Each structure stands twice: as structure tokens, then as C-alpha cells.
């Protein structure tokens, strides 16, 4: 690409926000430059710390069961080390805390991000779960913009989805009857992954049946609906369940095509192939700042051309990169995510004066960029089973060439078509809550959060069962992203200010997570009595009181859905963006990614970001 070349739109970042938006703008007839700091994960060579010298790509990208390894593949991973607490004494209680990594001071907890084409859709667990209607209605009330209400927003899910896990509903939709309001012709395929071999694993079947029966009773769901799990009716994305029956046992749809990962990468490349004259994808391009004229109009971006330039990269380069510029005839749209979009804005002079001026940056527009950072709290209830291995995992090494891999590669069958989740339950932590706030799901493996090497630990012992608990709708809005330095290759400083350090002074979040642990213990009580579970290793039977469980949650909780750091809302109320994604105090500059939400939506962030990107494309093309 020629330095200074002009396009209608420049989109920065190719994840769920940027990749989706760039493709839709190009389909709408606009010329688009999509800038991505990383490379194409299916064309790179990459390994992980436990298997040096062995290239695990493209399998780490493609194979659903390898999703943990994808997040630690050094060709595409960006390692952020974040603080959960400002207090060193509190932070160091977390066993995931690292003072140093690879000899470099990091002083935090690993927070895996993906610096690659497709962004975090290249390494996530592919779970596609619809947000709550109240999430959209809340934005509509905050902004006075009715186009954000839940009824209006559903069209964007229908536009992007190509549902393949409701065959009967698909037939009805072809006849013009679509009460589920799934999408059937969108670009993102969704599937249900239930390996047939699971039915032959009697230990697993008993675990699933006993856990499901207890969960049905606990949430007040008729046990007769257990068959819905088999018949694909326990669908968390069905419009009727979203609006009328939000609690219960569910399966977890995955964003896969023919049981291989599908995400923003596929959307971008397939659109670029159809419209090469409209969509230009520039890889290995690290954006350093937005360029403006004298009237705060965005005119383009400055970026560094070169591989592995960002210091979060798994193999950061020591070269400086080539400084280039690109011009936008219409708009610049930042889609770098909840960490990198605030960083780019602040390096461009848009942010808190208290952050910019001490670093010698001129304040162009003073806005609370980087404030309001939110995430979900997650913890694991980890069990060692009373047998050597799950039968379904026999012979599985999670490497290319084993029997399970051949089943996946040759026939798209077997355990590797799944991300490891086998059952989920949605519930309220307290009966009086207006919305469900807990998503509890069972995983075959040992998973207690993120630390260097976690992906190998998760699958190393084939006789573990982890119930992961996600706490939605946090009360804590005290997280913050700030600049470490004026060097765009440095990572920002990130502090989530967990629990009592944050804004949840009443302790509602902590109480809710403890309620989730007690729910899981009710599900597993029969499994323990029947001798299937040998031991609850974490939190462990020694922790029984509320205070003991709260201490466990405080010291081990994690998150991986960072959002809300450039929220939509009135400027005088702490908002950074207008309801049409424009940055307050500027022209021709928008943000479209997970940072735009005033409050973190639903249980899993990616479906909401995809929807936001589709809405943004509609807004931009309509204007």
C-alpha cells in the first residue's frame, strides 16, 4: 500500500467489531482500509511455551477443542498482565499472579488477547449466547434513541446468524414461520457440538443426567423438559426464551462452520475476495494515533508497518517498524477493543487531562476515556473424578495426529468438535433479581483461570470436571485503562479494581458468585454421594461458610470479557460516544467494539459486539 493512500473509511482492528463493520461497509459500496496489527492465523507458524519448536497452526485456530492453545499460541497472542487489585498484598494472594514473566516485570494476572486477523474471535471459546433484552433497552433509555431497543436490535442478530442447530425451526422459517427469530442466511454459522461418543461414556452420561435433573429442580423447571436438551429446544438464543423464560438448563451454541472455528477472519477474507476493489486488508499495521485537522476532524491515521511490533505479542520484535500514514475521505473508526481503543484515543490527545498532561500529551478533547472498565467475575469449582479418565477423552493428547484429531479432520466427528462445555444452567443469584445473572457451565478439564501455561494444565489430567461460574451485570464500574507511556508499542496500564476496591460497596457481586458456588454444590452432591467425584479440590470441602467462600472468590476470580471503557452516553454523564458511535467533541471519528457499552451486556460479549457492528454499519451507510 502506498503511504498516504486515501479510502472512504479506515477501520482499525479486525475483531468482532472491526471485521464485521469493514465487511458490511464494503458490501455497501464504500472503499475501506482495514488495519490489523497481526497476521493471518491460518498462515502463520506458532507454538506455545510447553511445546517449543512445534508449529500448532492452523490447528490451534481451527479445532474447537484446541481453543485454549489458540490463546497461548505465540504467533497470534497478545499477553496483557492486568491488576485485579491496586493492593499488592491482596493481588499476590491470587495463585495466578506473576511478578515476572520470561524475565520481564509484569506484576499482574495474565489476560489473553489476540493480535491477529479476526481479533479475539480467533482464540475465544466460540460460545454464541444472546445478550439480555434489558441490555439494549437500557442503552435506548440512556440515550433517548429508540433504535437501540431490544425489538429493534434483534434484526441485527437475524442478519448475521446462519443457524444450523435448529433443523425443524429452519424448515419452518423457509415456510415463512420464524417464532425463534434466528437468522438463517447470515454470514456467521452457529452449530451445536455434541460428540456422539459422549453417549457411550456412561460416567459422563450419569454426570449430565444427575446434574441436569438437580438443575431443573433448582430453577423450578419441569423435569419433563430434560428432553429439550436432546431436541435442541433448550436454546439460549431462541427469542421466546430470551423474552419469556430466561432461566433454566441450556446448551451452548458455537460459532463454527462444519465444526471448525468461524469468526471475523472468515467474514473479512470472504468479503475481500468478492470485493477486492472495495476492501483492502493491511496486516502487520500497528496504529499509533488518529490524525486530525484544526477543527478536530479525523483525517486519517498514523501506523507502524512491521511484524510483532506490539510488546504484548508472544514474540515481540525489537525492530521499530516503518512509520506510515493513511487518509480517510469520510471517517476513521476505531475497533481495537476495550484496552487498545482507549490507548489509541489517549495517544491522539483524547482522554482524561490527568492522564495526558503528565506524559506531555496535548489535550485535544477531555473525555473519561478508559474509565468505566467492566468485566464479568468468573470462578471455577474444580472436581477430581473417581476414575482415571473420561472415556470420551481416551487417547486424546490435544495434538495433531491422535485418534480424536483424525476423527475431527477426516469426518468432523469426535470430542474435538466441542470446546469442552457439556452442560449449562442460567439462573438468578437471588429470586428478587429482575434478570438472571449467573451462567454456570460444566467443562471436562481442570480450569481455574488464566496464567502462563494454563492451556496445557487444563487438559493434562483427563479425569477432572470444572463448573465455571460467570457473574453477569456487575455492580463494579471502577476499572480503568491508562497509559503506561507515550510509546504506542507499550501496553497500557489496566486495573479492574475488583470487589471492595471498586464501586460495588454493597458487595452484591461477591454474594452472587458465592450463590453460584452453592448452586454448583447442590448439583454435584449426588455425584459425590454416588462416588463419582473423588474430591472437590477448589474451593474445597474445608471452605463452607459465606466468608470462607468469599475469600476464595476474592483471591481466585478472573474475567476475560473486558468492555465499557469508551461508553455510549451523554458527555455530561461520563459518556465518550454518542448513540451513533461518534466520539464526543470530534467529527468523522467513531468507535465500534466492546468498549462502547455503558454496562457489560449478557453473559458472553461476542454476540453483542457482532450486533453492535451490524448496527453501526447500518447507521453509517444510512447517513
Q: Residues of each region from the PLM?
A:
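N-terminal redox-cofactor-binding region of secreted/periplasmic oxidoreductases
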Residues: 1-623
